[in-house]
Amino acid sequence: MKNLLTIAGSDCSGGAGIQADLKTFAAHGTFGMSVIVSVVAENTARVIDIQDVTPDMIKKQMDAVFEDIFPDAVKIGMLSTPEGMQAVAEKLTEYKPQNVVVDPVMYAKNGCALMQPYAIDTLIKTIIPLADVLTPNIPEAEKITGMEIKTVADMEAAAKKICAMGCKGIVVKGGHHIGNAVDVLFDGNEFYHFETERINTKNTHGTGCTFSSAIAANLANGLSVAEAVKNAKSYVTKAIEYSLAIGKGCGPTHHFVDLYRKAGMLE
């Protein structure tokens, strides 16, 4: 069994953040570990408050994991402050893990900022160069590049521009576009397009976390970047198709569809 680490924020409602990451790791037959960088008081409808963990505690959590159970892949999610980013970058540079997948989370599903605006420069300088795969959505890619992204060609141009910042590969997620959901992967050499029909549901809380964690799990399990992204796209699409209509806002995806089917708990 492969060991995976998520470095991200905690979502007490269970739909996103480390909770979504750990569910995704388990669904892919891997052992999940977590380093919490922020505690987020949120639910399906709103973000109430955010409490950031100190950089020193972030580093101690990372030391605790890496000195004992070295991860086969690392997923990085919400990093809200420059100081937190620098702490994570310092330890990743020290331990040099493989298969680092970075989801540059900037906003919650309801639009609440999860990354301080002045932290984007630090993200570009310290975190992006450590990524084997970066997974921004269109608004995040626009913030990183300063571009306006309206077409698939724009997504490709943004992917190239961000890849030049030091990451080895990038998936620009097209879920914010009208029409089918098209994701553009640039692996540093060539482009791949992954397209699925858009599912008409509001219950998409945690989809970005789930997608990036699935990529990390697939890489740890030995798949190529292109196959890892393809399989992650299929996994998250099914999770959205069977999403859970719970809460008063945007409900979460269903991370264990296949497991529930095999157990006879879901038709």
Question: Where in this protein do the model-derived segments appear?
Answer:
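Short pre-catalytic strand/loop immediately N-terminal to key active-site residues, enriched for Gly-Thr
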Residues: 7-13, 191-205
